[in-house]
Amino acid sequence: MVTVCERYEDDALMAEKYKIMKINVIGYIVNVYGCCFFFVFEGIRKRFSGSHFVTVVTYYPKYEDDSMPATTVRILATLILYMMMLTMIYSADTFTMVYLIMYKYKFITLKKYFENLREEFFALIDRGEHDMATEKLADGLVEGIKMHHALIGLSSDIYKAFGTVMALQVCQSSGSAVSLLLQIALSDQLTFIATVKLMSFVLALFFLLGLFLCNAGEITYQAAGVADAIFYCGWQSCPPRPKSDSRRNIRQLVVLAIMQAQRPLVMKAFKMLELTYGTFILVVRSTYSVFALFYAQHK
C-alpha cells in the first residue's frame, strides 16, 4: 500500500490526507466515548437515587448486592470494558478507516500523476521538442498503467484484511439500532438521560457505519475518475508511435488503460454487499422501516 505511487505523492495532498484521517479518527473516538459517558452518568444517577450502579452485566455481583465490594467490582468492570474498547477502536475500526482513506488518496495521486504528465507533455510540445514529448508520454503511460494495475490488485488484499470488519459493522449497526430504537419507543419509564444514552449509542453505530461506507464509496468515485485523467493526458497531439520504439503504440496503450480504468471498482462485504454511499442510505432506511413495522404491530 505504501510503496504504490509513493514517488509521485504531493506534500500538500499528503497533508490533506493526514488531516482527513485525523478528523475521522478523532470524530469517531469522541462519538464513542461520548456515548460511554452517558452510560456512566446514568449508572451514577441510579446509584445516588438508591438503585444500582450497573453498566456491565457480570457474573459477580448479583443484582441485589449493593455492598461496597460489589460496587467496586462494577466500577472496575466498567473501566476494563472502556480500556478494551480503546484497543478495539485502534486495532480494528480506526485501522480500517485509515486504510480506506489511504487507498482513496492513492487514486487521487494517480489522477494527479496523469494531469502532471499532460502538463509536461504540452510544455515540451510548446518548446518544439515533439519527439521527446512523445517518448515521455509513452513512458509515462506505461508507468501509470503499472501503478493503476497495482492499485486495483490492492482491493482484494483490503477485502481479505478488513472485509469481515466492514461486513459485521453493517449487520451490527442495523440490528442494534432496531433493538435500541424499539427500547426507546416501547418503554414508558425511561428517563431523559437514559433516552439520551440510547440515542447516542444509535448515533455512534451509524456514525461508524457512515465512516466505513462513505470512505469506501469515495474509493469508487475516485477510481472512476482515473479513466478521464488518462483520456485527457494529451495522446491526441502526438504521433501514434515514438521514433525510439516503433513497437509501442501510444493509442493502443491509452485504449487498454481506459478499458482497465472503466471497470467499476466497488468495495464489497460478503462478496455481494456493495460498500457505497447508496448502501449507507439503504441501511438507514431499512433500519427505520423495520423499527416502524415492529412499533406499529405493538401498537
What feature does the model see in each segment?
Residues 1-2, 229:
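Cytoplasm-facing ends of alpha-helical transmembrane segments in multi-pass membrane proteins
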Residues 26-32, 120-123, 127-299:
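Terminal membrane-anchoring module of integral membrane proteins
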Residues 98-99, 106-113, 218-225, 229:
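Membrane-spanning helices that line or support transport/gating and their immediate boundary helices
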Residues 2-100, 105, 112-130, 179-207, ...:
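Helix-loop-helix junctions within predominantly alpha-helical proteins
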